[in-house]
């Protein structure tokens, strides 16, 4: 079993374990979930993204962790931390919180609950001085969550 990084009232945030990548790809690679993320991914594109996710854990000790519901172990998505990699900007190296949840988990407060846990880890365990989140124009779901988390729009 993969190590549980933190937990909330309803959720476990844990490291990626055996079989998670295939399960995640199968349930998350839908037109609705991927709408704001460039569209449905090929297996090759997903594998490259997974290697980046696992690399965050290796390089920084944090990543986008698997989010499971405590009561039944259902994989709901991921949420966690990475470092910004935007060469040529002053953002590179800053902490970023991010999330992706399966469609049936939307609107139930899971993303906010997981994001609060990840933010607590950013400042508590990992010593983040600041924290960023990004989305694209039009993604009102993510914008709304950022605002409910107390984040301020910068652009």
Regions found by a protein language model. Give the residues of each.
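GNAT-family acyltransferases
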Residues: 1-104, 116-121, 125, 130-134, ...
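Conserved acetyl-CoA-binding loop-helix of GNAT-fold acetyltransferases
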Residues: 99, 107-121, 140-148
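Catalytic-loop Lys-Pro-X-Asn motif of eukaryotic-like protein kinases
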Residues: 137
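Conserved acetyl-CoA-binding loop of GNAT-fold acetyltransferases
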Residues: 147-155
